[in-house]
From Swiss-Prot:
Muscle myosin is a hexameric protein that consists of 2 heavy chain subunits (MHC), 2 alkali light chain subunits (MLC) and 2 regulatory light chain subunits (MLC-2). The keyword ATP-binding applies. The rodlike tail sequence is highly repetitive, showing cycles of a 28-residue repeat pattern composed of 4 heptapeptides, characteristic for alpha-helical coiled coils. It comes from the Eukaryota. InterPro entries: Kinesin_motor_dom_sf, Myosin_head_motor_dom-like, Myosin_N, Myosin_S1_N, Myosin_tail, P-loop_NTPase, XRCC4-like_C. Belongs to the TRAFAC class myosin-kinesin ATPase superfamily. Myosin family. This is Myosin-15. Residues 83-770 form the Myosin motor domain. Residues 647-669, 749-763 are annotated as: Actin-binding.
Length: 1926
């Protein structure tokens, strides 16, 4: 590019060459100069002076300071040639220091744009630069990226050119922090597209559209931009601008989508920030506007506008208001609309000034002045008192009635703010919709370029919910950049087999994104909290930290800072750590409005306000599910969910386009021009992935082209590499083309489907192409100019001759004009002509009448056409209605999805409630444990009291022993109580563990639900993708229908692929329906499981209540017992006192003795009562223990059932996951098949090389074997015969292998042809559409010419009108038939193809007839014009015109006859097409027979191998066997030669069988691995159960050891089986090696025998070929004779066919020779397949052995199960005996209670202890029996699974055996059907060639007819011009 084209902008874009040379002239030592880290400038320049042993380097800075730095911190410096380079990807040393230095130097010279690989880096200059003028736009228009300096216009031009060339939508993404310049650059891009579109074609309408596009941004900035701390004109909303273009690059329309308007700014701004610009523009406006809006000029008078700053130095609000009004006028805003926006803005300002106060002595509120309310109500068109009333006393719905509710001052203030925010947001959305309507030019749309300008990343002092949504959006966009630049790029290299070392990309942001948007992320928790009425910001915070703190590194607790705002949590984003304040998040997310005030707004007289709230739906007017009103009310969707939905839509739009990234950099925080903060820039470069993206772009291959596209575009560079005489694949052509050019061959790589180029290499190719094209065009122009000059010279010669003739005539006239007779002629001539004028007038009148009739007829025809047009429009409207109905159904589906989401949220809420209940139960358990602790304390106190009693009873010697016994008894009872307490504690722990288990199960179920929902979403995405693919297929099919007459040959090939796609789609749809049913079943299972959990919780609660009651009873008993103990203590004390008194007295009276006796009786009675109470307590405690144990057993059983249900659900989930994986694998089968084919090809080639190597080795051993030949012949003739047979088999298999490899190569060629034909079809379709449009225009012009001819010719026109009417009727009929055929083609493609073929043939014949008639009509019209001109001069010419008219009539009759003949020809062609169809169907049948024959041949080959193994004959029969083998060999060769064509067709079937065998292997391996996993899982489960029982039951240790021993035994058996399998594989490989060596020896011996038989076989082959040649020549000669008798043209065609037939014979001969080699390859492949089949059989046998072993193990397990059952029965019997003993003991205990006073206390205690021991043993036995039953159940399940596995293995073995038997039978039948198939194939080939030639004839005739039509149209136009001139 010439810098002079840029004008004054050149100095800011690129340095001149002299300046660059001056910069690059500095000397640099690359080994010493380097960059070192610096604290102030990040990196500074230094020079290496030396190094030390510890790895440090001594450097010297530019200031002379010497430093020692570690070597790894030094970064190399680039040479001066790269100083201020325009693309940083070209740097020699790509490091942070070099990138920073380059950006810093360019920014210092005000070069703000720099390329970094595929994307552009721009730095905000913070001042205006003259680089955006129109001359700069014109200079960048159409320039390649390498031609012009870096600029945002270059990015826009690149996107524009990619859109036109690649026919793909584009997008330009601006990313960066706030204040980096995203909005300004997006404005310049929009300006560029608008200006360039205006340059392409200047139209009034188009010019208006460009002006409107430029002005739309002004309105959006006024209403959506505001001043922030970092930016004076910051966009507080995101926008995605789609600029739609037509097919030729014309700008057709523009639409805008907005995202996340910051509503909170309307009512509050931080210090230093400002409200939206429109508020201050209105306040700075003229007085008339102030009077209209009732506002003043001071922003401080309004609360909503004065929270922060009120002025901006860089903005003039008054001028901005004028620009806003001008933009609204240009966009066509009506005055009501414009002032409606102003009024609502003013109303919001007055709204903010409204104040309220408390009424004195009342609790109600009232307005503190009504002035502001009156102003706001006036501007909004509502009643002021009603507004205030609705704010203070809103109506709410309670049940079915409405009730007024009083509000507080805070609530009213919040309601006013919410209404203001909602009003402004709705007004802004209305503005965007209005701008979109204005920018919709109703022109055709083809592609679009999207421009994304999203609010930049924000880290403010006070960060709220808006900042979280903004930063989340930037996280998603940065992740999209990483995914597109790093993941997709490197995956493309791997997929295309390009050698590549993966490069990591800085930061992976998915973890942070998941933390925000995953099901239990921040937004999800916020949504969940908004659903609960009692939720607060504090509950949201606690739930957030409970779920994620400590689990996610991106969530942190903030450090308290008194200087800043309070932060509740911090998030680690890619751009830094951001503290968030959650105050008011729930209210912001709900975004609730005062519905009473909204109802007043809906009745407003202000039309704009009423329309804004027209669609608002209250919370009590929700539409029931299933109705079709609208998708979702505004009140039912939160801010977070709406933003998340819009963001997902934006990401899908971006992923459907080709993105172009612009990374905007903020140079400094203070907004000072020219200053660059290095650390700030480095942080942005690291976060944006600039270095990694540049490295990938430099080392990778960012540009790539399909082989066909590359061949089509660059074939002009070397046309010699594309010979027209033979076919060359696209890849081979690309390789030869690039290899022939003088270029750097390291700059490109060849992939599988594409050719990849380094960055900038395509620009070199484009330059070479432009140079070649310029040469071609100059040569073409020279030839054309020479031709034109020759034509001009010839015209000059003709004019000279005409002048000479005219001069001669004038001289002759001058010589005779004075003769007398000549003067007499001059006088008589006018008189004669006057008599003829009347006749001419009469003739003209007749012509006028005839023309009037013709005009009436044409009008009638026009009316008919209008009626048809009306009917077509009606059909179009019907289709539109159908489309709308489908859209409604789609909306219903979306509503159902939303309903499902709601139900999911409700279920989650239910789960939350259950978890809360569980927490309550846990609290109850904690209370119980606390009570247990209290009981322990009481026991401790009782122990103290007992000790006191012991000290007191020591005094009495007589009662010492009794008191000691009592104390012992009491201590034992206390121990028993402690045991009870410990048991209760254990039970509480068990219940608590059960609760915890239920919680874990619930959590697992929630995870299952989330995984199922994800799987459902994936399936829905797959359905959407399949629907999109289906829609594309439908469009392609409709295009094919329009151009079917040109694509008949290719349609047959595409039909099968279409049917396969449709069948696969139906299959996928059915599977999806099955998956949905299974998903619903899973949901029902989850519901059932939740019901079970609820039942378990109920039972737990009941048990807890029972425990509580029992504990209360226990406490009551203890209290009574304590009382008894206290009374007993008192009595013992009294007794002691009495004894002391008795001892003191010594001998007292009888009264005292009676008193003592009474006291003793009382004491004994009390003691008896106490013992009865203790017995009662013990019986009740035993019963309670028993009940508690039973309840625990029931709970354990229920828990086990739940675990079983859980296992089933997990198994179902795994099955579903496997089925989903199967679906995905089916989708990828085509690619796998292709890859497998290529792998097989490489495998065949490797085997071929190995065979050649082995053959070389064998030749060395040939001499030794020849010496031992006689000895071998004498020793074993039988062995020699076997060797000969194996040699024959090897030769046969090698031929088949060669055939297979050649067929694979042919298939590759066919695949490339198909891809090429598909691309050609696409181009042909586009060309056909253009031709169709041209034909329509020409047809209209032709109608006009015909109308003019009607006025000139009366008689001719009458006849032509009749003919035209007939023709048009026929055409209409044909078009209707075509439409019917199109409809039928959508149902059945086969019938449509036939119908369209017939219709096309008829249309072609009619077109030919019409063209011939029009040609003759043009000739007749030209003759008639000559006649009329001659009649004006001479009367004699009138007779000639009559003759010409008669001749024309005769020609017309001849043309009519020709038309009839053409119709007959059409009928004949249709019959031939039917015959061709029949032959095609017969060929299909023959193909199927050939497939069966191929299978029979394979079976025969297997039989031959068996015969080789089984054959045992003597040496004397060797010669006979030799002759038989030779004859059989010749026969096999003849049959194989005849079946070569069939083998080509059946190659795909053989490959399919190979794939099936491989799949069967994989299936067996997968099943074995699954079974191993199941065994491993079973072992783990057994281990877990054994570990859990080990702590509680020591007796279960033996069973655990036994189970582990069995598992070890099974693992050892498995290892032994694997060793056996590996040994068997080794033996098979050794056997195959030995077999290969024997075959090599056989081949050497057989070569000597083949030499003698080769001559005979060659002669026989030549004879057979000659006979076939003769037969083919005779048939073709007969065809040629029949064609010669028809027409002379047929004779020429038959001669050509004869030549082609001879060439075909030669081709057949060459093909036969090539197929012989292929047959050898096929034979080798068949042998390999047999080996593989044998291996599969061996594997099946091994699997069967494994199954047998598994069955043996199952039998062992069943025996163990029987033993377990016996032990269980024994335990049951012992339990019954124990129960009987317990009953006996209870009876004995009752008897002992009666004898308690008389009996011994020790015996009772022994009995009680025995009872307790028996009860403990009973409980232990019960637990053991339960565990044994559970183990038995598990063993039964294992046995069932093993038996099922054995049955499956047997079924697989039987299936494989049947497949092998079928293959062998098919190989046997193949040989018998080969000859018939070959003859049929030859017949079909000959018939197909004939039909192909006939089709070529038809096409040639069509081309001739088209050329005649064009000539006739040209003549008709010339004739029309002549008639107009006359």
């Amino acid at each position: 590019m010439d810098l002079s084209d840029l004008g004054e902008a050149a100095a800011f874009l690129r340095r001149s060459e002299a300046e660059l040379l001056l910069l690059q002239a500095t000397a640099l030592d690359g080994k010493k100069k380097c960059w070192i880290p610096d604290g102030e400038n990040a990196y500074i320049e230094a020079e290496v002076k030396g190094s030390e042993d510890d790895g440090t380097v001594i450097v010297e800075t530019a200031d002379g300071e010497s430093l020692s730095i570690k070597e790894d911190k030094i970064q190399q410096m680039n040479p001066p040639e790269f100083e201020m380079i325009e693309d940083m990807a070209m740097l020699t040393h790509l490091n942070e220091a070099s990138v920073l230095h380059t950006l810093k130097r360019r920014y210092g010279q005000w070069m703000i744009y720099t390329y970094s690989g595929l994307f552009c880096v721009t730095i905000n200059p913070y001042k205006w630069l003259p680089v955006y003028q129109k001359e700069v736009m014109a200079a960048y228009k159409g320039k390649r990226r390498s031609e012009a300096p870096p600029h945002i216009f270059a990015v826009a031009n690149n996107a524009f050119q990619d859109m036109l060339h690649n026919r793909e939508n584009q997008s330009i993404l601006f990313t960066g922090e706030s204040g980096a310049g995203k909005t300004v650059n997006s404005k310049h891009i929009i300006q560029y597209f608008a200006t360039i579109a205006a340059m392409i074609e200047s139209r009034k309408k188009q010019g208006a559209l460009e002006d409107q596009i430029m002005q739309a941004n002004t309105i959006l900035e006024a209403f959506g931009n505001a001043k922030t701390l970092r930016n004076d004109n910051s966009s507080r909303f995101g926008k995605f601008i789609r600029m739609h273009f037509g097919a030729r690059g014309m700008l057709s329309s523009v639409d805008i989508d907005i995202y996340l308007l910051e509503k909170s700014r309307v009512i509050f701004q931080q210090a230093g920030e400002r409200n939206y610009h429109i508020f201050y523009q209105i306040l700075s406006g003229q007085k008339e506007l102030h009077d209209l809006l009732l506002v003043s000029a001071n922003p401080s008078d309004f609360h909503f506008c004065s929270c922060g700053a009120v002025t901006v130095e860089s903005l003039d609000d008054a001028e901005e208001l004028l620009a806003t009004e001008q933009a609204m006028d240009i966009l066509g805003f009506l005055p009501d609309e414009k002032y409606g926006c102003y009024k609502l803005t003013g109303a919001i300002m007055h709204f903010g000034n409204m104040k309220f106060k408390q009424k004195p002595r009342e609790e109600q509120l009232e307005a503190d002045g009504t002035e502001n309310a009156d102003k706001a109500a006036f501007l909004m068109g509502i009643n002021s008192s009603e507004l205030v009333k609705c704010l203070i006393h809103p109506r709410i719905k309670v049940g079915n009635e409405y009730v007024t509710r009083g509000q507080t001052i805070e609530q009213v203030t919040c309601a006013v703010g919410a209404l203001s925010k909602s009003m402004y947001e709705r007004m802004f959305k209305w503005l965007v919709a209005r701008i979109n309507r204005a920018l919709d030019a109703k022109l055709s749309r083809q592609f679009f370029i999207g421009i994304l300008d999203i609010t930049g990343f924000e880290i403010l002092e006070y960060n709220s919910l808006e900042q979280l949504c903004i930063n989340f959006t930037n996280e998603k966009l940065q992740q999209f950049f990483n995914w597109h630049m790093f993941v997709l790029e490197q995956e493309e290299y791997k997929k295309e087999s390009i050698e590549w070392v993966s490069i990591g990309f800085g930061l992976d942001l998915q973890a942070c994104i998941d933390l925000i948007e995953k099901p239990m992320g921040i937004l999800s928790i916020l949504e969940e909290e908004c659903m609960f009425p009692k939720a607060t910001d504090l509950t949201f915070k606690t739930k957030l930290f409970d779920n994620h703190f400590g689990k996610s590194v991106h969530l942190q607790k903030p450090k308290p800072d008194k200087k800043k705002f309070e932060a509740h949590f911090e998030l680690v984003h890619y751009a830094g750590v951001v503290p968030y304040n959650i105050s008011g998040w729930l209210e912001k997310n709900k975004d609730l409005l005062n519905e009473t005030v909204v109802a007043v707004f809906q009745k407003s007289s202000n039309r704009l306000l009423a329309s804004l709230f027209e669609n608002y739906m209250s919370t009590d007017s929700a539409i029931p599910f299933g109705e079709k009103k609208r998708k979702k009310g505004a009140s039912f969707q939160t801010v977070a969910s709406l933003h998340k939905e819009n963001l997902n839509k934006l990401m899908t739009n971006l992923k459907s386009t080709a993105p172009h990234f612009v990374r905007c950099i903020n140079p400094n925080v203070n907004k000072i021009p020219g200053i660059l903060d290095p650390y700030l820039v480095l942080q942005q470069l690291r976060c944006n992935g600039v270095l990694e993206g540049t490295r990938i772009c430099r080392e990778g291959f960012p540009n790539r082209l399909q082989y066909a596209d590359f061949k089509q575009r660059y074939c002009i560079l070397n046309p010699r590499t594309f010979p027209k005489s033979k076919f060359v694949s696209s890849r081979k052509a690309a390789e030869e083309l690039l290899g022939s050019l003088e270029i750097d061959h390291t700059q490109y790589r060849f992939g599988i489907t594409k050719v990849f180029f380094k960055a900038g290499f395509l620009g070199q190719l484009e330059a070479i192409r432009d140079e070649r094209l310029s040469k071609v065009f100059t040569l073409f122009q020279a030839r054309a100019q020479g031709k034109l000059m020759r034509i001009k010279f010839q015209k000059i010669l003709e004019e000279r001759d005409a002048l000479i003739l005219i001069q001669w005539n004038i001289r002759a006239f001058m010589a005779v004009k004075n003769w007398p007779w000549m003067r007499l002629f001059f006088k008589i001539k006018p008189l004669v002509k006057s008599s003829e004028v009347g006749e001419e007038v009469a003739g003209l009148k007749e012509e006028c009448a005839q023309l009037q009739k013709a005009l009436e007829k044409s009008e009638f025809q026009r009316e008919e056409l209008k009626a048809k047009q009306v009917s077509l429009t009606q059909e179009k409207n019907d289709l539109i209605l159908q489309l709308q109905a489908e859209q409604e159904t789609l909306a219903n589906v979306e509503e159902q999805c939303e309903w499902l989401i709601k139900s999911k949220i409700q279920l989650e809420a239910r789960v939350k409630e259950l978890s809360e209940r569980v927490e309550e139960e846990e609290e109850i358990n904690s209370e119980l444990t606390a009570r247990g602790r209290k009981l322990e304390d009481e026991c401790f106190e009782l122990k103290k009291e007992i000790d006191d009693l012991e000290t007191m009873l020591v005094k009495s010697e007589k009662e010492k022993r009794t008191t000691e016994h009592k104390v012992k008894n009491l201590t034992e009872e206390v121990e028993f109580l402690n045991e009870d307490i410990s048991k209760l504690n254990r039970a509480a722990k068990v219940v608590q563990e059960a609760h915890q288990q239920t919680l874990d199960d619930l959590h697992m179920e929630e995870e299952k639900l989330s995984s199922l929902s994800k799987a459902n979403l994936k399936l829905e995405q797959q359905v959407d993708e399949l629907e999109g693919a289906l829609e594309q297929e439908r469009k392609a099919r409709m295009n094919c229908e329009r151009e079917l007459h040109k694509l008949e040959g290719n349609l047959k090939l595409n039909r099968e692929s279409m049917e396969n796609l449709e069948s696969s789609q139906r299959h996928l749809a059915e599977e999806l329906r099955k998956k949905e049913l299974e998903l619903s079943q899973m949901n029902s299972k989850v519901e059932n499981e939740k019901g079970l959990v609820a039942q378990l919780q109920k039972t737990v609660k009941e048990l807890q209540t029972q425990i509580k009651d029992l504990k209360e009873k226990l406490e009551a008993e203890r209290t009574t017992r304590a009382k008894m103990e206290r009374e007993r203590a008192d009595l013992t004390q009294d007794l002691a006192d009495l004894n002391e008194r008795l001892e003191e007295v010594g001998g007292s009276s009888l009264a005292q003795l009676e008193i003592t006796k009474k006291q003793e009786t009382k004491f004994q009675k009390l003691h008896r009562d106490m013992e009865e109470a203790t017995l009662h307590f013990e019986t009740t405690s035993a019963s309670l223990k028993k009940r508690h144990a039973d309840s625990l057993a029931e709970l354990e059983g229920q828990v086990e059932n739940l675990q079983q249900v859980k296992q089933k659900l997990e198994k179902d989930k795994s099955d579903l996951q496997l089925e989903v994986d199967d679906l995905l694998t089916r989708v990828e089968q085509m690619t796998r098949a292709k890859a497998n084919a290529e792998k097989l090809c490489t495998l065949y080639e490797e085997r071929l090389h190995e065979a050649t190597a082995k053959l070389d080795k064998v030749t060395q051993l040939a001499n030794d074997l020849a010496a031992q030949k006689t000895k071998l012949w004498s020793e074993s003739g039988e062995f020699l015969r076997r060797l000969e047979e194996k040699e024959a088999l090897i030769n046969q298999l090698s031929r088949e292998k060669s055939n297979f490899t050649r067929q694979i190569e042919d298939l590759r060629g066919q695949l490339e042809k198909e891809t090429k034909s598909q691309s050609a079809l696409a181009h042909a379709l586009q060309k056909a559409q253009r031709d169709c449009d041209l034909l329509r225009e020409q047809y209209e012009e032709e109608q006009e010419v015909k109308a003019e001819l009607h006025r000139t010719l009366s008689k001719v026109n009458a006849e032509m009108v009749q003919w035209r009417m007939k023709y048009e009727n026929n055409v209409i009929q044909r078009t209707e038939d075509l439409e019917d055929a199109k409809k039928e083609l959508a149902i059945r493609l086969q019938e449509a193809a036939e119908a369209m073929g017939v219709a096309n043939a008829r249309n072609a014949s009619l077109e030919r007839a019409r063209h011939q008639l029009q040609l003759e009509l043009g000739d007749a019209l030209s003759d008639l014009g000559k006649v009329r001109s001659a009649a004006a001069r001479l009367d004699q010419k009138q007779l000639q015109s009559g003759k010409a008219l008669a001749d024309w009539k005769q020609k017309h009759e001849e043309s009519q006859a020709l038309l009839d003949a053409s119709q007959k020809e059409v009928q004949a062609l249709s019959t031939e097409l039917l015959k061709l169809k029949n032959t095609y169907e017969e060929s299909i049948v023959g193909q199927e027979t050939l497939r069966r024959e191929n299978k029979n041949l394979q079976e025969e080959i297997s039989n031959l191998t068996n015969q080789v193994r089984e054959g045992t004959k003597n040496l004397t029969e060797m010669e006979k066997v030799k002759k038989l083998i030779e004859e059989e060999k010749t026969e096999v060769q003849v049959t194989l030669e005849e079946t070569e064509g069939a083998l080509e067709r059946n190659e795909s079937k053989i490959l399919h069988f190979q794939l099936e065998l491989l799949e069967a292997k994989a299936e067996l391996e997968r099943k074995l691995s699954e079974k191993d996993e199941e065994i491993e899982n079973f072992r783990r489960k057994q281990q877990c159960t054994i570990d859990s029982l080990q702590s509680s039951l020591d007796s279960e240790a033996k069973s655990r050891i036994e189970v582990t021993r069995l598992k070890k035994k099974m693992e050892e058996d498995l290892n032994e089986m694997e060793l056996q399998l590996s040994c068997a594989n080794r033996q098979v490989s050794e056997a195959t090696k030995s077999l290969g060596q024997l075959q090599i020896q056989i081949k050497d011996l057989q070569m000597q025998l083949d030499d003698s038989t080769q001559l005979n076989s060659d002669l026989k082959e030549q004879v057979a070929v000659a006979e076939r040649r003769n037969s083919l020549l005779q048939s073709e000669l007969e065809d040629l004779r029949s064609l010669q008798e028809q027409t002379e043209r047929g004779r020429r065609l038959s001669e050509e066919e004869l030549l082609e037939a001879t060439e075909r014979i030669n081709l057949f001969y060459t093909q036969n020779t090539s197929l012989l080699s292929q047959k050898k390859k096929l034979e080798a492949d068949v042998a390999r397949m047999q080996k593989e089949a044998e291996e599969v059989v061996q594997e099946c046998q091994n699997a069967e052995e494994k199954a047998k072993k598994a069955a043996i193990e199952a039998a062992n397990l069943s025996e163990e199960l029987k033993k377990k059952q016996d032990t269980i029965a024994h335990l049951e019997r012992t339990r019954e005996n124990m129960e009987q003993t317990i009953t006996d003991l209870q009876k004995r205990l009752a008897e002992a209670e009666q004898m308690a006073l008389m009996g011994s206390r020790k015996q009772i205690q022994k009995l009680e202890s025995r009872v307790r021991e028996l009860e403990g043993e009973l409980e232990g036995e019960i637990r053991r029996s339960a565990e044994a039953q559970r183990g038995a159940r598990r063993l039964e399940r294992c046995i069932k699974e093993l038996t099922y596995q054995a049955e499956e293995d047997k079924k697989n073995l039987s299936r494989m055996q049947t497949q092998m038997d079928k293959l062998q039978l098919k190989v046997q039948n193949y040989k018998q059907q080969v000859e018939v198939a070959e003859t049929q194939a030859n017949q079909y080939l000959s018939k197909y060639k004939k039909q192909q030639h006939e089709l070529n004839e038809v096409k040639e005739r069509a081309e001739v007819a088209e050329s005649q039509v064009n000539k006739l149209k040209i003549k008709a136009r010339e004739f029309g011009k002549k008639v107009q001139e006359e």
